């Protein structure tokens, strides 16, 4: 069994969708100060794997563990430790950027408006704090979603295509924040189609081979 007592472990995970075997015995480990870059062609199960890892989808076979224990047995502790960003920013259009952060982050921990505004500042969208999400550009929404991840103060980041709709500056900023998170003792599992420009302990897993 592939189990890490100081991080995340995925051991021989299998997922089917109807007759299609989407994940075929996927295993991985991720420890503090590490980044795992997951790549692969469309339809190879990258998003499915992230959903399994964050506990949104139960695999037909296999085990996901956190600190040596099944995530189902330490659900509260695990959910407190992780921050998940899907491939869509998932913002409520009628709420402002700040309200979106307050709603999402408030489910995990107590947070002040000042902390949330600081996260928006770090991701370059402080000027959007009081604007409804529906008027923001795709790139701005992506930056707000990144601010949400920062605000959660989680040790484990699970990011699905975090560079989508970002310009060069936004891509560089996201890479820098990823590097800072990992260098600070965090861990990150990132689905991305292109190479990641970060100078950390980075592993790679390509699905569909």
What are these regions (language model features)?
Residues 88, 93-109:
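Q-loop/switch helix immediately C-terminal to the Walker
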Residues 157-161:
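Catalytic Walker B motif of ABC-type/P-loop ATPase nucleotide-binding domains
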Residues 94, 132-139:
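Conserved ABC ATPase signature
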Residues 146, 185:
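Hydrophobic anchor residue at the start of the ABC signature
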Residues 62-73, 77-78:
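Conserved ABC transporter NBD signature motif
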Residues 54:
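Helix-to-loop junction immediately C-terminal to a conserved catalytic motif
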Residues 102, 113-129:
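Conserved ABC ATPase "signature" region
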């Amino acid at each position: 069994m592939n189990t890490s007592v100081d991080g995340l472990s995925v051991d021989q995970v299998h997922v089917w969708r109807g007759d299609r075997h989407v994940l075929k015995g996927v295993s991985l480990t991720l420890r503090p100060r590490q980044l795992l870059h997951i790549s692969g062609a469309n339809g190879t199960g990258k998003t499915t794997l992230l959903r399994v890892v964050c506990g949104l989808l139960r695999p037909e076979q296999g085990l996901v563990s956190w600190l040596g224990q099944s995530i189902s047995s330490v659900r509260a502790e695990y959910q407190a430790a992780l921050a998940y960003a899907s491939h869509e920013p998932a913002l409520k259009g009628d709420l402002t950027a700040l309200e979106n952060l307050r709603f999402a982050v408030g489910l995990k921990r107590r947070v002040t408006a000042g902390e949330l505004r600081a996260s928006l500042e770090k991701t370059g969208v402080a000027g959007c704090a009081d604007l409804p999400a529906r008027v923001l550009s795709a790139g701005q929404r992506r930056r707000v979603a990144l601010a949400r991840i920062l605000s959660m103060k989680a040790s484990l980041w699970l990011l699905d295509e975090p560079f989508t709709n970002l310009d060069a500056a936004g891509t560089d900023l996201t890479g820098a924040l990823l590097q800072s998170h990992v260098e600070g003792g965090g861990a990150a599992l990132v689905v991305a189609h292109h190479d990641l420009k970060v100078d950390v302990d980075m592993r790679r897993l390509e699905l569909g081979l």
